[in-house]
């Protein structure tokens, strides 16, 4: 009896390959799919190098990113794996979050050791909150000298420690190319790599386990019943008759009770992350709430006006600005469902930011927004998206 393709029963983990150009990220990805397809044919299919390397273009908030998605399973887990072939694609993906990672495989060629992009990728992974990194030391078939490998390992551990990653993380010696060719020793190295992923990348916290949060998209008045707010539940779950807080955009929060939950015209007892639903609010007038606010579990989230963010600025070709911007630039920041104007402060020594750059900036919003680290936003001028970023630090 053939097993079903996608089993919900296994933990689902998002993973990706990162590292310097030509160190073998895509070859490693291809090798993982081949070796697992051979080991567990009923669970996996192999993806050829060319299929992964010719990454399809994706549009994420108007930004073009070349990125490949493959999936595979070990006995323990179901993995969704992203591979961004180009350095620029990797940076755009990390900042815009086209693919969120629960853990990353840092691919380093034993022949070169850590290179500038290796460092940059690890730094960026830290900034955007990738929780765990382990290492695939690739091309080990080309290095005979054990001492060289030891030196490279020391360098990698220093690099991980610099960015507060686990310096005791597994470093697995592999040859992705030899594994693709079917060499027994190196095929085993890929099995070891996946075992290390299973053992060392922590199970991600599921969105449903976090406190309730639903951004308001629309507001209706139902005569005789009250006000209904609709949106997609981003986190957590909520039962009828629980209290909620409505925060953001306005100075003061509103506290109320949810007296009804509706989805697809049916009344529900409860709703959870991923559902599109309407919440009937007790004693709330239509003018008390607005789009852009969020409905949350009381006390679980706070609105903020000042933050630091990591931002990718769209190039002219991507429909972005044609000219640079400077300190005190005042665009709109689009969070979840609404735009809020903000003032940009550039880092010390940065005179201006050119289209196509990535930059860290601090922002002061004119209205508070419920946020925590990792929240994504778009930067807009009117209806045109000119940048994308994520919150790296809350200031106030």
Curated annotation (Swiss-Prot):
Renumbered residue ranges of the record's region G2: 62-66
Pfam families: GTP_EFTU, GTP_EFTU_D2, GTP_EFTU_D3
Residues binding GTP, per UniProt: 19-26, 83-87, 138-141
Disulfide-bond pairs as recorded: none
Location in the cell: Cytoplasm
The keyword Plastid appears for this protein: no
Keywords for this protein: Cytoplasm, Elongation factor, GTP-binding, Hydrolase, Magnesium, Metal-binding, Nucleotide-binding, Protein biosynthesis
Region (G3): 83-86
InterPro entries: EF-Tu_GTP-bd, EF-Tu_GTPase, EFTu-like_2, EFTU_2, G_TR_CS, P-loop_NTPase, Small_GTP-bd, T_Tr_GTP-bd_dom
Domain tr-type G positions: 10-205
GO molecular function annotation: GTP binding; GTPase activity; translation elongation factor activity
Gene3D superfamilies according to UniProt: P-loop containing nucleotide triphosphate hydrolases, Translation factors
Enzyme Commission (EC) number: 3.6.5.3
Region (G5): 175-177
A GO cellular-component term linked to this record: cytosol
Taxonomic superkingdom: Bacteria
PANTHER family for this protein: ELONGATION FACTOR TU, MITOCHONDRIAL (PTHR43721:SF22), ELONGATION FACTOR TU-RELATED (PTHR43721)
Family per similarity comment: Belongs to the TRAFAC class translation factor GTPase superfamily. Classic translation factor GTPase family. EF-Tu/EF-1A subfamily.
Job description of the protein: GTP hydrolase that promotes the GTP-dependent binding of aminoacyl-tRNA to the A-site of ribosomes during protein biosynthesis.
Subunit structure of this chain's protein: Monomer.
Protein name: Elongation factor Tu
Organism for this UniProt entry: Corynebacterium diphtheriae (strain ATCC 700971 / NCTC 13129 / Biotype gravis)
